[in-house]
UniProtKB/Swiss-Prot annotation:
Keywords: Cytoplasm, NADP, Oxidoreductase. Its EC number is 1.1.1.-. Belongs to the aldo/keto reductase family. GO terms for biological process: L-ascorbic acid biosynthetic process; methylglyoxal catabolic process. This is Methylglyoxal reductase DkgB. The gene is dkgB. NADP(+) binds at residues 179-231. The keyword Signal does not apply. It catalyses: hydroxyacetone + NADP(+) = methylglyoxal + NADPH + H(+). Substrate binds at H97. Its main location: cytoplasm. GO terms for cellular component: cytoplasm.
Length: 267
């Protein structure tokens, strides 16, 4: 099994806004949807999916276990609740959203429990998010690298996270990029704008294409149908080696997501 290269993110979208975003995306041809327990939008996401009438086996639904639900007694019940909210019988991928702060719950405990959830048929694949190299090593020790479908991390032209990417690749763990556009900051980079002009593309398409050509999955979000459609077309854009080399020079380790009390010690 593998994970989709392109999907729809739903972070910060709630209620009717997320219903509209997911509905529009599905109509346009999106088939992978990324949500999380902490987004508090699993139910409206599920509603939009249900109302679309698209066969479940055509869809790839990802959710993430929040830190309050990492312990052995809470993880599987919380995932069952997520599945119920999503109005489905299973999810395709379940991630540990963040490692447990201060190791309150050990990596071995929550990864073993997540693997058990897979064994129960609640999730087809399992993975991790916001994991450093050390945390990936612990996860691999707990369940084996072959069980970890992806590490979903903040990754953009401004934060290329090469050490984490290299370690993941060496262990056969796919990388999914979130915040690929760096909250829009990367769109304003002159290098990105120039490449976009040369290809008759948008800056967002250039960045998404860059990430996909490096082998990363992407999950951009939008509430606008035009942007949803435009982002989807990034899959058809092919950047050349010179373009890729120029974007590589933009890396400045500029991390935008590092919540106090939640973020691990980054590589």
């Amino acid at each position: 099994m593998s994970i989709p290269v392109f999907g729809l993110g739903t972070f910060r979208l709630q209620d009717q806004i997320v219903i509209d975003s997911v509905s529009q995306a599905l109509t346009l041809g999106y088939r992978a949807i990324d949500t999380a327990q902490i987004y508090e939008n699993e139910a409206p996401v599920g509603q939009a999916i249900q109302e679309s009438g698209i066969n479940r086996d055509e869809l790839f639904i990802t959710t993430k276990i929040w830190i309050a639900n990492l312990s052995k007694d809470k993880l599987i019940p919380s995932l069952r609740e997520s599945i119920q909210k999503l109005k489905t019988d299973y999810v395709d991928l379940t991630l540990i959203h963040w490692p447990s702060p201060n190791d309150e719950v050990s990596v071995a405990e929550f990864m073993s429990e997540l693997l058990k959830a897979k064994g129960l048929g609640l999730t087809r694949q399992i993975g991790i998010s916001n994991f450093t190299i050390d945390l990936m090593k612990q996860a691999i020790a707990a369940v084996g690298a072959e069980e970890i479908a992806t590490n979903q991390i903040e990754l953009s032209p401004l934060l290329q996270n090469r050490n984490v990417v290299d370690f993941a690749k060496q262990n056969g763990i796919a990388v999914t990029s979130y915040m690929t556009l760096a909250y829009g900051k990367a769109l304003a980079e002159p290098v990105i704008k120039t490449i976009a002009e040369q290809h008759g593309a948008t800056p967002a398409q250039v960045i998404l294409s860059w990430a996909m050509q490096l082998g990363y999955g992407v999950i951009p979000s939008s509430t606008k149908a035009a942007n949803l459609a435009s982002n989807l077309l990034a899959q058809k854009l092919c950047l050349n080696a010179a373009d890729m080399a120029l974007i590589a020079t933009l890396d400045r380790n500029e991390r935008l997501v590092s919540p106090d009390g939640l973020a691990p010690k980054w590589d």
